[in-house]
Amino acid sequence: MLGEIKTAQADIRDLDLGVSQFDIIIAAAVFHHLREDGEWSSVFRKCHHALRQGGAIWISDLVSHPTREAQAVMWDRYGAYLEQLRGPEYREHVFAYIEQEDTPRSVLYQADLLREVGFREVEILHKNGCFAAFGAVK
């Protein structure tokens, strides 16, 4: 039997994922748009409920750093990349957009939250600067 792929493009806070509907959830550049801790918790819990036992969530997203010093270094590196890509105006545009629209959290915050809502295995696949790929198994 062939598997079925379902895609969704919507505000994750409003999306009804159901219960035990999926074997895998892939969230790319989704969660950094969440604002308050309550939203983070609610959405992670929703994803946990939507997965079948043994299912997994895999996340690739913009992340922050828990220490100011590390955040400053990583932000400088990201800014240099953006400036090299399209110039200083582009860097300022991206940073202004992030400041207005995004609230990324650290990988450690998200890993702890995945465990808190019931995921049993958390795996960090990759982290480079302000971006990370990680996931968890239900």
Model-derived features: positions:
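C-terminal alpha-helical "lid/dimerization" subdomain adjacent to the S-adenosyl-L-methionine
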Residues: 60-117
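Core SAM-dependent methyltransferase catalytic element
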Residues: 111-138
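A conserved beta-strand element that flanks and buttresses the S-adenosyl-L-methionine
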Residues: 26-27, 58
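Short catalytic micro-motifs in class I SAM-dependent methyltransferases
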Residues: 29-33, 61
